[in-house]
Amino acid sequence: MGKNTDKLYITQTEHSGVHGWHGGMSGIAQKNSTTSYKQLPFNYCSLSLQPFNHPCCLVDETKQAIIFDFRFIVPWLRKHGTNPINGQKASMSDLIKLKFAKNSAEEYCDPVTMKSFTRFSHIVAIRSTGNCFSWDTIERLNIKPKHWRDLVNEEQFTRDDIITIQDPHNVENRDFSAIQKQKETARDEKITKAKIALQASRAKSTESTSSPELSHSLDSSKSIASDMPIHRASHTTGYAAASLTSTSFTPVTKNERAIIAEEDYMLNHTRIKHKGYARIVTNHGEINIELHTDYAPHAVYNFVQLAKQGYYRNTIFHRNIARFMIQGGDPSGTGRGGQSIWGKPFKDEFCNPLKHDDRGIISMANRGKNTNGSQFFILYGPAKHLDNKHTIFGRVVGGLNVLDALEKVPTNSNDHPKLPIKLEDIIIFVDPFEEWKKDEREKEKRKRQEEEEENNLDRTSWTGRDLSASSTDHSLNASVGKYLKKEVSLEEKTFTSTVNPKKKKARTGFGNFDAW
């Protein structure tokens, strides 16, 4: 029911669409949709879209400054050498360092009037000095009186040195949506180029692999790589469960056991039973040692591989304590250096019956629990207090007289030998890991031979007939046109007679009259 206050015409508020949508505001809505933008604040980096800490800028041909942060623009210029916003060529020399003043409230402001900068402020900077001012300040104190000196440090400049940081009437270079669109366009171009390169490489690989020479070489390389067996873990890869719970994962419907790396499988203390043997060559003589691969595989593997690489060559024994031990294995000779073959410390190995109870025991030196590197020591006598603190991985089996000579070398107060004890080289006589690999290859070879013999038996029937021959004949016919009649070969045509046989003439006469 109408009220007496209702107007009989459309008011301005109703026509403008303040309280809702109607047909009369379609033109305004279209205008707003075309002119809407998201302005990037002046104190934000155009590359990272985050507030800058070390502001700088690149200037385009219209003297509009594009603001960046040094932390993000420098790596970009080193890698691409272009302006990330407009794609123009740029270098480190084109960067201009900007200097913004701050007031007591820690807000960016004009250094002369101390007026805070906002999104509606017209901000300019001097190219030669990098100082940022309000346009009103520059116009009133520099342009109109023609006083071409910086208002902060009195450095002279020209009108061309004035660059625009932010113009509230021209915010195209600070349009957030335009910057995002340019980044997405550049990303799409990279993806397109990568797809084209991938297709070209695939086409090239298919052409190259189609050649018989390359296919033969690939087959030979596969056979060499497959000499060692593939070891599987007791757990699965987990791909089936991951594909079930994640929509972004490629569907997998089969559980497969995970593959164990050869080194991880080999360094299990139950795998290798071979002992290793090596010789330590010093300037006082040679010492033969035995390596306990079955008790400390990681320590032995580390020692053997470092020795093969020449890591211990021409080093010194930096610590020598009579009736206790002699220590070496540090290339720096200080006792604070050296690293393992893996580049990081490895764990201790105490799950064995070995004890520090005899002369000639070889153990790993460390700085604490699970800090083994490259240093080792040889005992001059029993040291039970070292049990379960240092990993035992070998013992001296020859050259104890050389060990006696090393023990007699005089030392200083820091236990450093007064005369250098040089470790000239370590020679590996028996590498237990190479022996294990040979055994594994032989086992794999015997296994394949047995499988081939079983397959040969499967291809022979109980009557002794070779089923592979019939299968090959069938495979030859399994092609296009196998149901068409086979053409007669030339040999068949030559041996086929084309002369028709002579017809026998019927005999005439009286014949025999016995039936009469």
From Swiss-Prot:
Q: Which CDD domains match?
A: cyclophilin_RING, RING-Ubox_PPIL2
Q: Where is this region: Disordered?
A: 197-222, 439-474, 492-516
Q: Into which family does the record put it?
A: Belongs to the cyclophilin-type PPIase family. PPIL2 subfamily.
| Domain annotation U-box: ranges | 38-115
Q: Which residues form a coiled coil?
A: 433-461
Q: Supply the SMART domains for this chain.
A: Ubox (SM00504)
What is one cellular component GO term in this UniProt entry?
Answer: nucleus
| Catalytic reaction equation(s) | [protein]-peptidylproline (omega=180) = [protein]-peptidylproline (omega=0); S-ubiquitinyl-[E2 ubiquitin-conjugating enzyme]-L-cysteine + [acceptor protein]-L-lysine = [E2 ubiquitin-conjugating enzyme]-L-cysteine + N(6)-ubiquitinyl-[acceptor protein]-L-lysine
Q: What is its EC number?
A: 2.3.2.27, 5.2.1.8
The record's subcellular location field reads: Nucleus
Protein's recorded name:
Peptidyl-prolyl cis-trans isomerase cyp8
Q: Where is the composition biased (Polar residues)?
A: 458-474
Q: Describe the function of this protein.
A: May catalyze the cis-trans isomerization of proline imidic peptide bonds in oligopeptides thereby assisting the folding of proteins. May also function as a chaperone, playing a role in intracellular transport of proteins. May also have a protein ubiquitin ligase activity acting as an E3 ubiquitin protein ligase or as a ubiquitin-ubiquitin ligase promoting elongation of ubiquitin chains on proteins.
Q: Which UniProt keywords apply?
A: Coiled coil, Isomerase, Nucleus, Rotamase, Transferase, Ubl conjugation pathway
Biased composition, class Low complexity, residue ranges = 206-222
Concerning SUPFAM superfamilies, the annotation shows:
Cyclophilin-like, RING/U-box
Higher taxonomy? Eukaryota, Fungi, Dikarya, Ascomycota, Taphrinomycotina
Is the Coiled coil keyword given for this protein? yes
